[in-house]
Design a protein with these regions (language model features):
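A short, flexible loop at the N-terminus of ABC-type nucleotide-binding domains that lies
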Residues: 1-32, 41, 55-58
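Hydrophobic anchor residue at the start of the ABC signature
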Residues: 154
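Conserved ABC ATPase signature
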Residues: 140-144
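ABC ATPase nucleotide-binding domain signature region
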Residues: 48-118
Length: 214
């Protein structure tokens, strides 16, 4: 029997202000890489919030199976990155970009400081090689290019060894060359045996070739 990493059946949020028009029934099967595609305001973010357990359900069931992970909590196994601005940064990186500017770059943290200590040395080596992080370690985060910021944040997130990685609009604000680079990086990520990738996209043209389910 195939493993269902995320299974929601007839899901309706308890909070009436954050309900979709219809109950949600959806299965994420192990080995699938999924794209959730829709226009702005279509409810993509709310769907992700339901799948990750952010909103308790009034009706329906939500079941996780994150094997071979040592824990079965959504907090440990599902990581979400929202790329919101032209720098390609999400919550944490956006904070750093706004906090430090050209007048106080000396106080801005280095990439190596923000990545911190790593418990799994094998995973660290694999990710550093995949994203070519070594040349970036001595750089200040505020000075990273949009492509470098994407790679930094993916590395920082993946060092937590999630089972499911959800990325919201990962291609927003990128030029053509950087988009192609990110396509290549994500395709390599999709080959990691224990990682399931979910992309939240606004346009069908952004769907990479490794996506197996829409």
């Amino acid at each position: 029997m195939q493993q269902h990493t995320i299974h929601i059946a007839g899901g309706v949020a308890r909070n009436p202000l954050v309900r979709l028009s219809n109950p949600v029934t959806l299965d994420f099967l192990d080995g699938e890489h999924i794209a959730i595609v829709g226009s702005n305001g279509a409810g993509k973010s709310l769907l992700v919030d339901l799948l990750t357990g952010k909103y308790p359900l009034r009706d329906g069931t939500l079941v996780y199976d994150f094997r071979p992970s040592a824990t079965q909590t959504a907090y440990d196994n599902i990581k979400y990155i929202a790329f919101r601005d032209t720098y390609g940064s999400a919550d944490a990186n956006y904070y750093y970009q706004q906090r430090w500017n050209a007048h106080d770059q000396e106080d801005a943290p280095l990439v190596c400081d923000l990545l911190g200590e790593v418990k799994d040395e094998s995973l660290r080596q694999q990710l550093f090689e995949l994203f070519r992080i070594e040349p970036m370690l001595g750089k200040k985060v505020i000075l990273l290019s949009s492509g470098e910021l994407r790679k930094f944040q993916l590395t920082k997130t993946l060092l937590t060894d999630p089972r499911v990685l959800i990325m919201d609009n990962p291609f927003i604000g990128l030029d053509a060359a950087t988009r192609e680079l990110l396509y290549t990086v994500l395709e390599k990520l999709a080959q990691l045996a224990s990682l399931q990738i979910v992309l939240v996209l606004s346009m069908l043209d952004d769907i990479p070739s490794f996506i197996t389910l829409l």
